[in-house]
Amino acid sequence: MSEILEDAIKSKAWPFEEAKKILDSLNGKTPEKGYVLFETGYGPSGLPHIGTFGENARMVMVQKAFEQLSNIKTKLICFSDDMDGLRKVPSNIPNPEMVAGYMDMPLTSIPDPFGECESYGHYMNAKLRSFLDKFGFEYEFYSSTEMYKAGMFDEMLIRVLEKYDEIMELMLPTFREERKATYSPFMPICPKTGKVLQVPIHKWDAKLGTITYKDENGETIEVPVTKGHCKLQWKPDFSMRWAALKVDYEMYGKDHLANGRLYSEICRILGGKPPVQLCYELFLDENGEKISKSKGNSISVDDWLKYAPVESMALFMYQNPTRAKRLFFDVIPKNVDEYITFNQKYHLEEDRTKRFANPVYHIHHGNVPKIETFGITYSLLLNLTSVCNPSDKSVLWGFISRYEPKAMPNNSPYLDHLAEFAIRYYNDFVKAHKSYLAPSEKHKAILQDILDMLKGLPEQIEAESIQKGIYDIGMKAGYENLRDYFKDLYQILLGQSDGPRLGTFIKLYGISETMKLIEEKL
C-alpha cells in the first residue's frame, strides 16, 4: 500500500470517511455492474437553488475521495423527478395563472411558463443541467418521465405488484387513518386528463401487470403499471430506483431522515441492496426557515457568483454537512476569507495528512490552485470600498498597488476579481445599511490621540506597528472591554459595528487618507 493511500485511509475528512463506508459495504470488490453508482436527486417543481448545487458538489467530493481509495470505476447520475404531479404553483415564475390550470399534471406535461422549452419540467431540467455543466460536474442525467415511459423500470414495477402486500404492511402504519384508506404505492396517470392520480387501488394483478381503480366519475379503469402509465409514490419510488439502478451511494436532506429505514426496507423487499446513505442538514434562510425552490427564499447560485468566486460557495457546502446552517448574503464575505486562509495553509503545509484534511483539497479534488492576495482579504476590500466609494475597481487598485507594489491585476487575477466583487457587494448590501456613530467628547479625544500618533509615522511603516499604536491608545482610554473600543471606532469611521484589523486597513487605505477621514469626524 502506498503512503498516499495510507494517509487517505487515515484521514478524518468527511469525504474520506464516507468513501470508506462505501468501500466497506462492497467488501473492497467491484460491483457486478462494473462500477460504483452515486446518485443525486432533483425535484424540478421550482427553479434549482443553491442546495441543489450543494448536494452535487458534496457528492463529487465523496466520489473523488472514493476513487482515491480504490481502483473501482465510478459513475454519477443526477435523477430528476420530473414526472411528479404539480402540487402548488411556485411564487417566483412567470405566468402563474396559466400554470395553475395544470395542477396534478406531470411536470413534463405542463407548458413552459418561460416560453423556452417544450414543458415546465424540461425548462427546470435545462436550468439544472446548465449550472452542473458550468461547474464541470461529470454526470449522466436521468429523467423520471423518460425512464418510466421507456420501460426502464418495468421489471421493478411488476415486482412492486408481486410484493404489494409486504410494501403496504410497511407503509400503512406511517399514515393517519384517513390516508390509510386511500393509499397505494401506485399513482396511475389518468388516460382522460393526464393527471397523476392519488386514488385507492381496488385490484392489482402481477401476472397481467395491471391495477384497477375508479376515476373521479366513478368509472372503473384498468391500466398497466408499465411504460409510463403509472408512477410510484415518492417513498416507494426512491426505493425502487435504488433497486433498479443498483445505487451504491445516495445523499438526501434531513426532511428524508424519518423515511431512511422505509427506503432501505422496501429496497430489500424488491431484491435490492440499499446504498450507503448520508443525511445532510437543510439550509435555513435569514429568518431560520427552510429554504425552498418554490418560495424562492434563498440565495441562488447566480446570486452567490455575482459577489464571490465559486470556490467560496463550494467551501460553504463542504463545511459541516450534517449541521444546519443559515444561508443568506452575510455569509459570503466570511466564506471568501476562509477560503483564502485555507488555500494559503494548504500550500504552506508539507504534512500530507493535514493537506487531506484541508477543505480546499476536496473542493479542487486534489488539484489546488495557488492564489495570491498579498494579505488582502475580501472583508478588507469591503471596508476600503466603504471609505473611498469607488466607481470601479481601478480606484481600489490605486490603493492596492501602493500597499503592495508587486500586486497588479495581470499577476493577481484572484485579487482583481475580489475587487470587482467587493464593489458589487458593498453597493447592494452594505451602503444602504451604514449607520455612523456621532463621536462624543471622549471619542473625539481618542480620535485626536490616534491622529497625533499617525502624524509621526512614515508611510512605509508596517501594519502591525500601526495596530500596536491604536491598541496602546485603547488601553489608556478607560474601556472595560477593548472590543467596545474597536466597535466604537468602526461605527465612527466605517459606519458598522465590526471591521478589519485597523492597522492593516490604515496601511491599505493610506496614512494621510486615514488622517483626513479622522479629521472629518472631528
Curated annotation (Swiss-Prot):
| Annotated keywords | Aminoacyl-tRNA synthetase, ATP-binding, Cytoplasm, Ligase, Nucleotide-binding, Protein biosynthesis
Biological process terms from the Gene Ontology for this record are: lysyl-tRNA aminoacylation
Q: Which reaction does it catalyse?
A: tRNA(Lys) + L-lysine + ATP = L-lysyl-tRNA(Lys) + AMP + diphosphate
Residue numbers covered by motif 'KMSKS' region: 290-294
Cytoplasm listed as a keyword = yes
As annotated in the record, motif 'HIGH' region runs over 44-52
Residue positions binding ATP: 293
Gene Ontology MF term list:
ATP binding; lysine-tRNA ligase activity; tRNA binding
- Gene Ontology cellular component? cytoplasm
Superkingdom per UniProt: Bacteria
Q: Where in the cell is it found?
A: Cytoplasm
Q: Tell me one Pfam family matched here.
A: tRNA-synt_1f
Q: Where is this chain primarily localised?
A: cytoplasm
Record has Cytoplasm as a keyword? yes
Instruction: Supply the EC number(s).
Output: 6.1.1.6
InterPro entries given in the database record: aa-tRNA-synth_I_codon-bd_sub2, aa-tRNA-synth_I_CS, aa_tRNA-synth_I_cd-bd_sf, Lys-tRNA-ligase, Rossmann-like_a/b/a_fold
Supply the NCBIfam families for this chain: lysS_arch, PRK00750.1-2
Instruction: Name the family.
Output: Belongs to the class-I aminoacyl-tRNA synthetase family.
Mind telling me what this protein is named?
Lysine--tRNA ligase
Q: Which organism is it from?
A: Rickettsia bellii (strain OSU 85-389)
Source organism phylogeny: Bacteria, Pseudomonadati, Pseudomonadota, Alphaproteobacteria, Rickettsiales
